[in-house]
Swiss-Prot record:
GO function terms (MF aspect): electron transporter, transferring electrons within cytochrome b6/f complex of photosystem II activity
Superkingdom as given in the UniProt entry: Eukaryota
One GO CC annotation: chloroplast thylakoid membrane
GO biological process, one term: cytochrome complex assembly
HAMAP family reported for this sequence: Cytb6_f_PetN
Self-association and partners: The 4 large subunits of the cytochrome b6-f complex are cytochrome b6, subunit IV (17 kDa polypeptide, PetD), cytochrome f and the Rieske protein, while the 4 small subunits are PetG, PetL, PetM and PetN. The complex functions as a dimer.
Name of the protein in question: Cytochrome b6-f complex subunit 8
Source species of the chain: Cryptomeria japonica
Membrane topology: Single-pass membrane protein
Gene: petN
Length: 29
């Protein structure tokens, strides 16, 4: 595994997690 691939995967995880928090927050959960 190269460092760029790991960094890109980590970025996608953080982005997906933050987006989920925004959606849940607007849903009132």
């Amino acid at each position: 595994m190269d460092i760029v691939g790991i960094a890109w995967a980590a970025l996608m995880v953080v982005f997906t997690f933050s987006l989920s928090l925004v959606v849940w927050g607007r849903s009132g959960l």
